[in-house]
């Protein structure tokens, strides 16, 4: 399992870093317990709570044909005080 795809850096996610909450996009087929186990094992931290939501895909036009991108899942991971995750790399666009 790959788990986390990449970190998300938006105004809201940067504001949540002050509350020890980390935002990242994950595989859409993964569950909360899988991601929680993977984060605790890989980073050596304790997860208190996880919030997730599925974001819709975007429309993409290819000539006269209208297509769309796949939906994806975003998780907000709350850690216990005293724990932190090192900075994740930002996805290149």
Curated annotation (Swiss-Prot):
GO terms for cellular component: chloroplast; ribonucleoprotein complex; ribosome. Its main location: plastid. Pfam families: Ribosomal_L23. Keywords: Chloroplast, Plastid, Ribonucleoprotein, Ribosomal protein, RNA-binding, rRNA-binding. It is found in: Plastid, Chloroplast. One of its GO terms (molecular function) is structural constituent of ribosome. Disulfide bonds: none annotated. It comes from the Eukaryota. Part of the 50S ribosomal subunit. Binds to 23S rRNA. HAMAP family: Ribosomal_uL23_B. Belongs to the universal ribosomal protein uL23 family. This is Large ribosomal subunit protein uL23cz/uL23cy.
